[in-house]
Amino acid sequence: SGLLQSLDREDNTEARALYLQGYDGNQGYIFDRIMRGKNIRIEAVCLSVLGGIQPGKLKSYIRASVSGGHGDDGLLQRFGLLVWPDNDSKYINVDRWPDTAAKTQAHATFKKLDDLQFNVDEETSAMLPVEYQFSPEAQNLFDDWRVEFETMLRNNEHHPAMESHLSKYRKLIPAIALVCSLADGEQAVSYDSLLRALAWGDYLKSHADR
């Protein structure tokens, strides 16, 4: 909640714009620093936000987004992995050893991702992003899903704020599929990776509906 509150301040509009633009991960960004006499350009902005927020505080941002006020600029919709907790009155004590094998596997995956190599421009020596594509089977699955998804978005059964949120799934689903694919060391995004992403998307939509 501290991050969202800081982005609400009038003197922090530039930071809010950075978070809005950094969602796509394929653009640069210029910080205007007049007092220092120069602008600061970030060639490629890609932001990930990890954290938690109390449901009560989140409600105020949802209301601002739905009402069409100052919060209706698409920032909240960019938090596509948000989940809403269950209110379980029964306490269950969980006391078990950490899964060492899973922790080791996770660290190995993080190391593998950190070692990914960029392409290099032969003339300028500039680093270029590596492009990953769907496998033919995954592409067919994505095309079928996209037709069904776009039809659902156009059925006029959702609030405009919900439509805005769900429209981000056009990027979110391929992004999750790519994460799954990279974690598994695939050369192309496979059918199974996309299938996992679609299942995750169904789960996230159920929480968005809440």
Q: Model-flagged regions — what are they?
A:
Residues 1-210:
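Phosphate-handling catalytic cores of nucleic-acid transaction enzymes
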